[in-house]
């Protein structure tokens, strides 16, 4: 690991808990060579970045990962070029972490990495195909799902009365607000005190609401949002306007998730659990950025299939 930035430490921790990767970390190389022997994680700092050529030969290293706190003036360019041309793989910590985990690590992430790395392509043909699929599937889903929606509406009315639907302002494509529609799964006036995150085992949720949420049936009315073009079948989940305003001040690049239509389901929803804190929201953003970077119909299909697993078996992320 060339450098001691937090991104590299996080990557090493991920490698250490995943023996199936068959990767062995030889050690860290410190930027200034002042902390040799210090343990960041197992293994420790074994030299300075200027010794990278000698250490690679001595240890038989096949891959060097860059995780420098400051690259300007600290990168041993000539040595890395020699290693690259001799067959040693040179990678960036963020790129390797992305491939390993299916998310983009926000720690030490420079904006330059985002615009220089491959991805974030949104061709007109891809977006047009995605929109056509949204229209066709949402229209079919509404037609076939009307009887089920009627049963759900009746069950909500019997248990807690009106209203049947829950409407709330959310932030959509280009940070434009829209009104999301869901089957009401909480008691009336559950959010009278203001915007708040959903919680696991939330006491505000009704008995029918627990069942609807378990199988994602409360999301069915969002097919109308998709048909109107406010949402997509797959995309980053839309957040409440009040929470968005707060999160954009706290989390770097949070607003980037609004570069696509929000989705009924998304990569973060099938890969992560509840996000009820700022820290958990950051983790979900890492998955959202991965989805935006790697946008494709193939990835959409994988997410939809994973969502069906949740619907059929009542388990998964929220």
What is each model feature region?
Residues 33-38, 97-110, 166-204, 265-286:
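Short, glycine-rich, amphipathic interfacial segments at transmembrane boundaries or analogous
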Residues 1-13, 24-27, 162-187, 206-207:
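Membrane-cytosol interface motif
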Residues 198-261, 303-311:
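A short, structured surface patch at a secondary-structure boundary
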Residues 44, 101-142, 164-168, 197-199, ...:
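Glycine-rich flexible loop motifs, especially short His-Gly-Gly/GGXG/HXGH segments used as catalytic or interaction
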Residues 206, 228, 251-318:
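C-terminal terminal-structure detector
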Residues 1-103:
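A solvent-exposed beta-alpha-beta segment
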Residues 125-190, 225, 297-318:
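A hydrophobic, helix-centered structural microdomain
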């Amino acid at each position: 690991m060339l450098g001691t930035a937090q991104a590299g430490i996080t990557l090493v921790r991920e490698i250490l808990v995943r023996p199936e990767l068959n990767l062995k970390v030889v050690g860290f190389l410190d930027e200034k060579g002042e902390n040799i022997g210090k343990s960041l994680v197992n293994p420790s700092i074994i030299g300075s970045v200027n010794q990278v050529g000698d250490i690679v030969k001595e240890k038989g290293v096949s891959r060097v990962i860059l995780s420098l706190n400051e690259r300007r003036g600290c990168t041993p360019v000539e040595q890395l070029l020699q290693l690259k041309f001799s067959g040693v793989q040179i990678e960036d910590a963020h790129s390797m972490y992305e491939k390993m985990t299916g998310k983009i690590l926000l720690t030490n992430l420079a904006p330059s990495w985002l615009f220089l790395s491959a991805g974030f392509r949104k061709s007109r043909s891809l977006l047009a195909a995605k929109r056509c699929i949204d229209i066709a599937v949402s229209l079919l889903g509404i037609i076939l799902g009307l009887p089920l929606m009627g049963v759900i509406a009746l069950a909500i009315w019997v248990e807690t009365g009106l209203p049947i639907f829950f409407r709330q302002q959310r932030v959509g494509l280009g940070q434009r607000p829209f009104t999301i529609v869901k089957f009401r799964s909480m008691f009336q006036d559950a959010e009278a005190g203001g915007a708040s995150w959903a919680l696991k085992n939330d006491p505000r949720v009704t008995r029918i609401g627990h069942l609807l949420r378990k199988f994602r049936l409360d999301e069915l009315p969002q097919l109308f949002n998709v048909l109107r073009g406010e949402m997509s079948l797959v995309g980053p989940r839309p957040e409440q306007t009040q929470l968005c305003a707060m999160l954009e001040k706290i989390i770097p690049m949070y607003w980037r998730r609004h570069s696509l239509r929000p989705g009924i389901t998304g990569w973060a929803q099938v890969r992560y659990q509840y996000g009820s804190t700022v820290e958990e929201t950051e983790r979900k953003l890492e998955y959202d950025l991965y989805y935006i970077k790697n946008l494709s119909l193939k990835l959409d299909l994988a997410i939809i299939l994973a969502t069906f697993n949740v619907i059929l078996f009542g388990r998964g992320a929220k």
